């Protein structure tokens, strides 16, 4: 359903705790504390994700590479696969434990709204669940129980929302999982071909039936995750390039913001111009300094009751 009243997009760049337009996600806000969602389903899904990666590691190393007679083949593929798997798990951890862009709770006060210096006739929205002023493009997540800036969706596999501050890590996670899935499938095919040409008893330290079962399981896992993560990766890149989140597409919201170009959106999501840091889950998003006067993140005052606040027009 389309929004009947256009939201006020300037709140996002004027409210403290919400970055100005030229500033990427706040550095001190992201690093101040560990972010973790205590959701049973999400925790189980995250554990399953790590288990499946370690299972793939086990099959690749102990079933295919270590028993191989070709040392160069084992070293090259072992180094490549383990490096990609490590980057995938690191990206998963960052996506899971990074604040996706939560709006501070309880800032829907009269004093706070006055400090924003809004223009007459402008409209701001209060989230009745968070008691906070919702910036444009922020949506409330029922699992995280917070309003998230530029929320794309809540992903149980990373036990977190994918939002403004952690979209980079989610994109990297899907990319690296896609790559190790493809790599494992290629190695399984080569291993099967070598085993058919050679003696199965010399092909692996495991028995032939156990080897076949493990390879089939890895093949099934690799194919499943290759399809899933490649679709998710493409969806996320398309979302960044079109400057429209998944939830905005789902709700068919009319854009009240000025859309950015594809390359500018990529630079914003990944923290600057194209460089090797784009592919690293260990680098934080850079933040430019804002010269505007600061506004208190947690202003004092009573929470207003209205969910839609319109700044009154000046009397003539």
Swiss-Prot record:
Topology class, membrane: Multi-pass membrane protein
Domain DHHC, residue spans: 124-175
InterPro entries attached to this UniProt entry: Palmitoyltrfase_DHHC (IPR001594), PFA4/ZDH16/20/ERF2-like (IPR039859)
Catalytic reaction(s) noted: L-cysteinyl-[protein] + hexadecanoyl-CoA = S-hexadecanoyl-L-cysteinyl-[protein] + CoA; L-cysteinyl-[protein] + tetradecanoyl-CoA = S-tetradecanoyl-L-cysteinyl-[protein] + CoA; L-cysteinyl-[protein] + octadecanoyl-CoA = S-octadecanoyl-L-cysteinyl-[protein] + CoA
Biological process terms in GO annotation: peptidyl-L-cysteine S-palmitoylation; protein localization to plasma membrane; protein palmitoylation; protein targeting to membrane; regulation of G protein-coupled receptor signaling pathway
Residues on Cytoplasmic side: 1-45, 92-169, 234-316
Intrachain S-S bonds: none
One GO cellular component term: Golgi apparatus
Keyword Cytoplasm: no
Chain residues carrying a lipid of type S-palmitoyl cysteine: 144
Active site: 155
Subcellular location: Golgi apparatus membrane
Pfam families for the chain: DHHC
Membrane topology, Lumenal segments: 67-70, 191-212
A GO MF term: protein homodimerization activity
Record remark on domains: The DHHC domain is required for palmitoyltransferase activity.
Biological role: Golgi-localized palmitoyltransferase that catalyzes the addition of palmitate onto various protein substrates and regulates their association with membranes. Has no stringent fatty acid selectivity and in addition to palmitate can also transfer onto target proteins myristate from tetradecanoyl-CoA and stearate from octadecanoyl-CoA.
Record's subunit section: Monomer. Homooligomers. The monomeric form has a higher catalytic activity. Forms heterooligomers with zdhhc7.
UniProt xrefs under PANTHER family: PALMITOYLTRANSFERASE ZDHHC16
Family: Belongs to the DHHC palmitoyltransferase family.
Name recorded for this polypeptide: Palmitoyltransferase ZDHHC3-A
Protein encoded by which gene: zdhhc3a
């Amino acid at each position: 359903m389309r929004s009947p009243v256009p939201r006020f997009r300037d709140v996002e760049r004027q409210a403290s705790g919400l970055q100005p337009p030229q500033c990427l996600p706040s550095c001190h806000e992201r690093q101040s504390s560990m972010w973790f969602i205590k959701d049973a389903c999400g925790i189980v899904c995250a554990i399953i994700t790590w288990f499946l990666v370690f299972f793939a590691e086990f099959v690749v190393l102990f079933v295919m590479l270590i028993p191989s007679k070709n040392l160069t083949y084992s070293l090259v593929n072992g180094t490549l696969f383990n490096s990609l798997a490590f980057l995938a798990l690191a990206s998963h951890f960052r996506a899971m434990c990074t604040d996706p862009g939560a709006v501070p709770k309880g800032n829907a006060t009269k004093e706070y709204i006055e400090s924003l210096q809004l223009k007459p006739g402008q409209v701001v929205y209060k989230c009745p669940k968070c008691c906070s002023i919702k910036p444009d493009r922020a949506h409330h997540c029922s699992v995280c129980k917070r309003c998230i800036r530029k929320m794309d969706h809540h992903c149980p596999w990373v036990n977190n929302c994918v939002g403004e501050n952690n979209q980079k890590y989610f994109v990297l996670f899907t990319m690296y999982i896609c790559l190790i899935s493809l790599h494992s499938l290629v190695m399984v095919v080569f291993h099967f071909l070598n085993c058919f040409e050679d003696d199965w008893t010399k092909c692996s330290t495991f028995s032939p039936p156990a080897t076949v079962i493990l390879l089939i399981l890895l093949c099934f896992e690799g194919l499943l995750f290759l399809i899933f993560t490649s679709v998710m990766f493409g969806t996320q890149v398309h979302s960044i390039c079109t400057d429209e989140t998944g939830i905005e597409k789902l709700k068919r919201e009319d854009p009240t913001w000025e859309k950015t170009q594809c390359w500018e959106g990529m630079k914003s999501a990944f923290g600057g111009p194209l460089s090797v840091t784009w592919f690293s889950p260990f680098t934080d998003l850079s933040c430019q300094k804002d010269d505007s006067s600061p506004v208190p993140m947690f202003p004092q005052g009573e929470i207003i009751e209205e969910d839609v606040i319109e700044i009154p027009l000046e009397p003539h």
